[in-house]
Amino acid sequence: MRRICGLLLAAGMAASAGAAQAVTVDEAKTIAMDAYVYGYSLVTTEVTRVQMTNVDKADGLHAPMGQFGNVKRYPPADYRGVSAPNADTLYSLAWMDLGSEPWVFSHPDMGDRYFLFPTYDLWMPVIASPGSRTAGGKAAHYLMAGPGWKGEVPAGMTKIDVPTRYVLILGRTYANGTDKDYAEVNALQAQYDLSPLSSFGKADYVYKAPPVDPNPGYSMTDKPQQVILGMGTEGYFNRLATLMCHDAPPAAEDAPIIAEMAKIGVEPCKPFNLSALGPDTAAALKDLPQQALDLLGKNEATMGVEKNGWVFAQVGAYGTDYVKRAVVAAFGWPANLPEDAVYPYTMVDKDGQPLTGANKYTLTFAKGEEPPVNGFWSITMYEIDQGWWFVPNALNKFTVSPRDNLVPNADGSVTLYFQNESPGKDKEANWLPAPKGAFLPMIRMYWPKEKSPSILNGSWLPPQIVKVD
């Protein structure tokens, strides 16, 4: 994974307070690119927060601050919203403002149903993962405490320290796609609860949505990438400096790059003036936003590691790998920890040839060697068309998994069929309909097992896909 180019890691190279230091045009370009990439996840997350919450009522993945928005069913076959849609779990999303006091997130007893509530700060790493893996299915209360809060945690609550003012919960609750199961999940979603700590448990607490801002400063419908490009270099760095001031202070491990950024005048709480760097440098940085996005696009193509023909990406935790964090923000915002979910995918068969619906393919799990998970696994079929999308088909079937009552072979192995036309009624339980053109299957493995065989340590890998002559 490519690291930030030109970053001087020597601690103690702090810039003097105030004006930017004298640097050459080339030095300024290098530092500016580093700074832009460093802040990309923060600015992306903040733009996304505003777009998702600047509404007067909950509707799907949009809801006012302090309220859950719940998705009630899988996306339809013709969905073209967010690439690589999910047909295994229903989303529940909520943002909270911890600036005045902590908030409490509560969920009911989930029984043996798989669920996951990854929690993110504004920089986009997973800071906690309440759910089946970490806490089991019993009802629970989580105290979300913002920076500097020193109060007493009430009995029966689990504290989650949040290093930024705002916090996101992007929950997933398993659903099998039937109307009966949707109703059961929707009933659980209705019990996902948020309240300020001062109002927790008070029967007279009534949620009141914040007013909608009619002039938020940018489009509420454009993709965050486009919104950020529209900020320009000066606007972007000013937004970054403002966010780092109070809402999202940089982590201690970021001190080296913060010192570098100060050399061109990008500092928390201080206005950034591009012209102060001189006309030559200002001209050289004019196209920085597009250049940075191009850089992230190139890194997206090489971020995953290929194993046995399948591509894996280790995301969710980033440390000082600012490029990886920015790539995920740009093209896969946000992401789970591998311990919670792994999503290997492939675009080629065992001979390295691109997968296409013009051919027929099989994937066979040897007896006892299906994906090793504590949660569940499934394989989703996507057609490739400026994104990854469901494949409309007569069965309205977008995934194949054990919930299809897979039919084993005589030796106990399980063969799955990836093709455009039905392999026959007797094989349709194991069939994942493919488009006529290019496609990719993605395996979703929730709560993968840690002991071997495990996808986490590479002792288990998905079998390769075989073209059928």
Regions found by a protein language model. Give the residues of each.
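Gram-negative bacterial Sec-dependent N-terminal signal peptides
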Residues: 1-22
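A compositional/structural signature for long, glycine/proline-rich flexible linkers
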Residues: 20-469
